[in-house]
Amino acid sequence: MSQTSLQPVHVVGGGLAGSEAAFQLAERGVPVVLHEMRPVRGTEAHHTDGLAELVCSNSFRSDDAQTNAVGVLHAEMRRAGSLILRCADANQVPAGGALAVDRDGFSQAVTAALAEHPLVEIRREEVTAIPPEEWDNVIIATGPLTSPALAQAVLELTGESALAFFDAIAPIVHLDSIDLSKAWFQSRYDKVGPGGTGADYINCPLDKEQYEAFVDALLASEKVPLRDFEAKTPYFDGCLPIEVMAERGRETLRFGPLKPVGLTNPHNPDVKPHAVIQLRQDNKLGTLYNLVGFQTKMRHGEQVRVFRTIPGLENAEFARLGGLHRNTYLNSPRLLDGTLRLKAAPRLRFAGQITGCEGYVESAAVGLMAGRFAAAERRGEALVPPPATTAHGALLAHITGGHIETVDAGPRSFQPMNVNFGLFPQLDVSPKGADGKRLRGSEKTLAKKRLLAERALSDMSAWLDTPAAAA
């Protein structure tokens, strides 16, 4: 099919995801109209009208493709011909093992690449409503600062009750870093919920002295100040930061998320805990657990320090630390299909942070997939998602259905997530040392990461070599 006979795909939003999606489409011979509202309408966080402007950090995080999940994502994106990674590499600044960029040079490079592409038209205009029906193939990549008018239009189309709010993020811990000689599995009152066993939570007990010390640590910890535009956004219902609850009274937590009722510590069954911190399974693979009720605005270093004082979490490895900030994202597992299309209106795809991924690289990766899916659809080709064993596939699985929704967490338990090895399907066999013996501790963790990374990159290369993906 000649490219001149193809109708354009419309991409709404010129951030990391939208820019990557537009490039992937154009590189596959599909004309693109990229709609970016800046400078016609600005946001509280952007300072330029450049495409792919980095509004916070200039770091794309670790570039280690052997033992770090985001480094694996970098490597996969490079193999897939990512514009964002190409421009990041070209504008790299020294940052140790991380990939950091000159933010202005990076944005200028992305803008130039798209402006100069013969199949890309950039329109500087705000899209304030669901695109018209004649736009039969659309990618909405409007990010965490989606304009109010478009956000309201999406709400009305999906029937969701909330789209923009203060996003409460609880810390997530790798299961294999929790000390189960101190913690234990049990649901409150041994209650068996849907799909549960009555032992669905991990419980970490605190005696009175430990509880008082924990409250003191929360109150004394250093917090992240809210930016001006965030201060105007109300808290999401039921998502007060844990340190704010502690400020309301020293016993507040013990009668709230840390209540000890209905639980018996099998390691010390004759002593009732003064308080109990619970962790709930966070992914279907059962490799990640989140700290229930622990949304927080403590600085990341403080979170690690304070949370590792909890019995059983002394050596906790965090897949994600907690946070509280203004965000706009969909309840994607319920609303999107496996190729990021809106179930209620399949001509619309979503990409980037609005889908519930977290981070620059993750946003661009979802844009890359959305662009490839939209191109395949426009060209009449099969839509083949990347394998779940790849970083891209693991991220896609989380967004479109990998997150557990629990009854007690309410109707909106899906939360944004950075890519991490806890999202990957686990290995069939445990890693072994050169002597054939099973590895333990940190050696096992490192070997496991290496094997997951090797598998991901191998499977990504195989996927890219398939006719549908390579087209």
Curated annotation (Swiss-Prot):
GO terms of molecular function: flavin adenine dinucleotide binding; tRNA (uracil(54)-C5)-methyltransferase activity, 5,10-methylenetetrahydrofolate-dependent
InterPro entries: FAD/NAD-bd_sf (IPR036188), MnmG-rel (IPR002218), MnmG-rel_CS (IPR020595), MnmG_N (IPR040131), TrmFO (IPR004417)
GO cellular component entries: cytosol
PROSITE patterns, A to Z: GIDA_2 (PS01281)
Highest taxon listed in the record's lineage: Bacteria
GO biological-process terms attached to the record: tRNA methylation; tRNA wobble uridine modification
Pfam families, per database record: GIDA (PF01134)
EC nos: 2.1.1.74
Enzyme class: transferase
Entry binding sites for FAD: 13-18
UniProt keywords, alphabetically: Cytoplasm, FAD, Flavoprotein, Methyltransferase, NAD, NADP, Transferase, tRNA processing
Subcellular localization: Cytoplasm
Required cofactor names: FAD
Classification via SUPFAM superfamilies: FAD/NAD(P)-binding domain
Reactions catalysed: uridine(54) in tRNA + (6R)-5,10-methylene-5,6,7,8-tetrahydrofolate + NADH + H(+) = 5-methyluridine(54) in tRNA + (6S)-5,6,7,8-tetrahydrofolate + NAD(+); uridine(54) in tRNA + (6R)-5,10-methylene-5,6,7,8-tetrahydrofolate + NADPH + H(+) = 5-methyluridine(54) in tRNA + (6S)-5,6,7,8-tetrahydrofolate + NADP(+)
Family statement: Belongs to the MnmG family. TrmFO subfamily.
Protein's job: Catalyzes the folate-dependent formation of 5-methyl-uridine at position 54 (M-5-U54) in all tRNAs.
UniProt protein name: Methylenetetrahydrofolate--tRNA-(uracil-5-)-methyltransferase TrmFO
Species assigned in the record: Azorhizobium caulinodans (strain ATCC 43989 / DSM 5975 / JCM 20966 / LMG 6465 / NBRC 14845 / NCIMB 13405 / ORS 571)
